[in-house]
């Protein structure tokens, strides 16, 4: 027994998931689904995948967003991913990504390449922060549309082999 440590566990199997501090606030998996409904709008998200590792220490939920961008006629899909840990090893992370998350590898790729995310620790204010995230993500959706415009501009620029060699030489 530790005075300042507590265990999280799965109530369906009574399996401990991790040791946490007294200020740790649990974010239930159901809250991830509710977040999508609130942030995107009920019936707007197209649910893609949900998964977990181990006994449920880490979970993710992903949804395809309804509006794709087109770059020279090719659709670029956008996904919203909610990931959470239940063992004290991390917090809640919510991100936009063009990567369709279906497993641990694609989740890690999405996290490592995304600059469009919010992250929160499991403190008593985590639910307030998740609410603020909805506003932040609303702004991010606008930025994603702007990103599509920039992609189309870049896709129409002609680049020669010499341009590429010069660029690499100047930037390596």
What are these regions (language model features)?
Residues 30, 34-172:
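Intrinsic disorder/low-complexity polar-acidic segments
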């Amino acid at each position: 027994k530790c005075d300042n440590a507590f265990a999280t566990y799965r109530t369906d199997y009574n399996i401990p998931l991790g040791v946490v501090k007294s200020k740790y606030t649990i974010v239930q998996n159901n809250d991830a689904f509710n977040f999508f409904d609130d942030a995107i709008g009920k019936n707007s998200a197209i649910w893609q995948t949900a998964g977990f590792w181990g006994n449920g220490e880490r979970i993710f939920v992903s949804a395809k967003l309804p509006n794709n961008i087109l770059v020279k006629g090719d659709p670029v899909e956008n996904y919203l991913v909610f990931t959470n840990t239940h063992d004290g090893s991390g917090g809640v992370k919510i991100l936009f990504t063009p990567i369709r998350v279906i497993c641990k590898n694609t989740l890690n790729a999405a996290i490592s390449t995304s600059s469009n995310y919010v992250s929160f620790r499991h403190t008593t204010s985590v639910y307030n922060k998740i609410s603020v995230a909805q506003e932040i993500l609303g702004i991010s959706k606008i930025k994603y549309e702007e990103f599509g415009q920039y992609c189309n501009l870049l896709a129409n620029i002609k680049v020669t082999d010499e341009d590429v060699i010069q660029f690499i030489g100047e930037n390596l």
